[in-house]
Amino acid sequence: MVPVIALVGRPNVGKSTMFNRLTKTRDAIVGDLSGLTRDRQYGDATWQGRSFILIDTGGITGDEVGMDEKMAEQSLMAIEEADYVLFLVDARAGMTAADQMIAEHLRKRNKSAILVANKIDNIDPDVARAEFSPMGMGNAIPVAGSQGRGINALMEAVLGHLPRDAEDEALDQEVAEGEEAVRIPGPSEKDGIKIAIIGRPNVGKSTLVNRMLGEERVVVYDEPGTTRDSIYIPFERDGEKYTFIDTAGVRKRGKIHEEVEKFSVVKTLQAIKDANVVIFVMDAREGVVDHDLNLLGFALEAGRAIVIALNKWDGMEPGERAYVKTELERRLFFVDFADIHFISALHGTGVGNLYKSVQAAFKSAVTRWPTSRLTQILEDAVSEHQPPLVNGRRIKLRYAHLGGANPPLIVIHGNQTESIPKSYSRYLENTYRRVLKLVGTPIRIEYKGGENPFEGKKNTLTDRQVNKKRRLMSHHKKAEKKRRDKR
């Protein structure tokens, strides 16, 4: 399971700055979900190949009233959701009563935490550590979040405390043995294709899970984890193995009440990261709302294959259906590669077709193509539409190879690749998608420059070359002297 890290502390100690730096600001952020995650933002972050979910919270002072009280409650909830806590304090302001209160709360909850002394600009780190030592949280790690100072040391400490899964250990073993570390995930014999059913509350996720499992389902086990873990439900259909990653909690047939289904952002984000394919469920009667876009954006940034299911399609008038389809085209243009199904989970209409799209999306996400195939597609694309000129020189793209899967990562080598415009990258992405007939999965393209490895370096001559150079110079001097003497 993907670990969850919460940033907590008083207001204005630099939590949001730290959040933006660790998520690199370009990663998907799922936050500001009204009534559920006010002043909690969720981001997908990766450090040294290790992925985790980061939670940014509002400040805690201990004397909140009104809206501030609600914000503080959300921060305390984030602590409960997290596997690990980064407790930020302000090195300039020194230790406060609010800092001590938060430290006491973390001790009571028995939470694993690291004390982070932020804003150490022009402050002696040893002085900062001594200032906060009375709180009993161990030695503070000094950082300057706005400048990035100390972040590497902080993350080294954090990663040392986070659990490692089998995939991380296998990757480390490959690196230790000198193998190329490219993850190409596939369905294990035990799990099959892992499918996450995600969506807002009350869109019919529970009903869809049970409808897809069916009356004749083969469930090996229902194994609930901790209160933060999802439920993994292995089953078979037509000889194919699947595993549902269900975020709606334990349920029994006939006892599902959609109106009380609990929604957990953390469960959903963890399910997305752990899945091969995401089935994104929407309520056709409500159309596309901002919450849908937030969650769908996170699935896209995580690189997961996506299938969209528009539930509660039955009973809608033709005019309503036409309007919803228009809205889908307008607002979901960024996932136009995903299959869309119009279903009724309650009555089973169209549900069976989801499996075909799941298999197609998974196949597209994990298929391995040889370098020769990817390079030929690149050459054909460049021949049809050349890259632009940069300072009078044409960008050259030489060859391409597969760098990873789920999502497919195509690595393209060439020169001046840092100057390739986004429009040309989209052209290449669309070309690969069309030629390889990819459906249901995003594609990522990464460029590698072809810098001259000898640029700026002097050649070191061998002894033989030095002697030869001396002989040539001596011969040249003698010949020059003879020409002068003849004159």
UniProtKB/Swiss-Prot annotation:
**One Pfam entry name:** KH_dom-like
Gene Ontology molecular function: GTP binding; ribosome binding
Report residues binding GTP 1: 9-16, 56-60, 118-121
Sequence segments annotated as region (Disordered): 449-487
Q: Where is the composition biased (Basic and acidic residues)?
A: 449-461
Q: Which part of the chain is the KH-like domain?
A: 367-451
Tell whether Thylakoid is among the UniProt keywords.
no
Comp. bias intervals (Basic residues):
467-487
* The EngA-type G domain, residue ranges: 3-166, 193-366
Would you tell me the protein name for this molecule?
GTPase Der
What is the native source organism of this protein? Pseudomonas putida (strain GB-1)
Q: What is the lineage of its organism?
A: Bacteria, Pseudomonadati, Pseudomonadota, Gammaproteobacteria, Pseudomonadales
Name of the encoding gene: der
